[in-house]
A protein has these predicted regions:
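Alpha/beta enzyme core
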Residues: 52-67, 74-100, 110-257, 264-295, ...
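Short, hydrophobic beta-strand segments that form beta-sheet elements in well-ordered domains
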Residues: 105-107
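Histidine-centered metal-binding segments
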Residues: 3-19
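Anionic, Ser/Thr-rich low-complexity intrinsically disordered regions
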Residues: 18-21, 36
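Polar/charged low-complexity regulatory segments
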Residues: 18, 27-31
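N-terminal basic/disordered segments at the start of proteins
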Residues: 46-47
Length: 313
């Protein structure tokens, strides 16, 4: 990875007179992490005012439908409720053959075997939240075991939560080691790292968390668990997109984005789409690199595409 080369050269050059920093702090120095929250708010306002309307059309809404991670992460989930969700995804293909199916079904790993045995639609990924979601606070052995078992049961993508407390204590090495170990447990499965942006306090922290997560092995960065007071915001997504772009420019490695939590309206979804389009461009506008974690949005998108209220999901 190009970035480590930069860092090694950098360390070699400075080691005799600078206090020894670890390679993670060194990585952060290669990026602009001093970000003004007010500037970000203004930039987002401008995008919403000037650009979102360009994407307010049926084609984009179809694309968004195909980017949805149909999510059920409730304490009340049961085999029955999850099976009902899978059957809707199975039926959707028959009922709306001209519309794209959702990108994934996202659930707790106890349901993975059930989902993988009952899902009949090709190309719908099975996503599990692993590693003691949503707090991430469990022993590493437990987190690794949960992840390996999920993959074994048929999960095709894994969502984990960054250890937020370690990040806020500036234990960047601990953060990266944890993420790297989880990545190892995922094997070939793409891994999304949830930054829990609503708990990070400011744009600079969101930028730092994004960089550390990518550097430690994230294939996607995701805004939120949906379990905290503040979930996804356009401002957080804007900063995350900037980080993804800078990381791509430096390393050539493309990282995906998943806004999730509190995406309640079609306009919310269009806003995230527009931010990605403006900052990252066309290359990210496929359902491989752009995902929306939501449950309630699916019917709203479907209703707008069809032109009447639909409660399919």
């Amino acid at each position: 990875m190009a970035i480590t080369k930069d860092i090694d050269a950098h360390e070699h050059h400075h080691h005799h007179h600078a206090p020894q920093t670890n390679k993670y702090e060194e990585a952060l120095t290669l990026y602009n992490t001093h970000i003004d929250d007010v500037e970000i708010r203004e930039a987002v306002k401008k995008i919403i005012a000037e650009k979102v309307h360009e994407n307010d059309n049926i084609e984009t809404k179809k694309f968004l439908l195909g980017s949805v991670e149909l999510t059920s992460l409730h304490t009340t989930d049961s085999n029955e409720s999850i099976l009902a969700l899978v059957e809707k995804v199975n039926k959707f293909d028959t009922e709306y053959p001209n519309l794209p199916h959702v990108a994934t079904i996202c659930a707790y790993p106890v349901f993975t075997e059930l989902i993988s045995q009952s899902l009949e639609v090709d190309g719908v990924e099975i996503v599990n939240v692993c590693g003691n979601f949503p707090s991430s606070l469990s022993r590493m052995e437990v987190k690794v075991a949960e992840t390996s078992l999920a993959v074994n049961d048929g999960a095709t993508e894994i969502d984990i939560v960054m250890p937020v407390g370690k990040f806020l204590s500036e234990d960047y090495e601990g953060v990266c080691d944890d993420i790297a170990e989880m990545k190892h447990a995922c094997g070939e499965c793409p891994m999304k790292v949830i930054l829990e942006t609503g708990d990070l306090g400011n744009s600079s922290n969101i930028k730092k968390a994004s960089i550390l997560a990518m550097y430690a092995g994230a294939d996607y960065i995701k805004t939120s668990t949906g379990k905290e007071k503040v979930s996804a915001t356009p401002e957080a997504a804007y900063v995350m997109c900037q980080a993804i772009k800078e990381y791509y420019d430096k390393t050539g490695i493309q990282i995906g984005l998943k806004p999730a939590g509190g995406i309640n309206t079609v306009m919310d979804a269009l806003t995230y789409y527009t931010i990605v389009k403006e900052i990252l461009g066309k290359k990210w506008l496929t359902n491989k690199w752009f995902r929306l974690g939501t449950s309630r949005l699916t019917n709203l998108l479907l209703s707008e595409i069809i032109g009447k209220e639909v409660k399919f999901f």
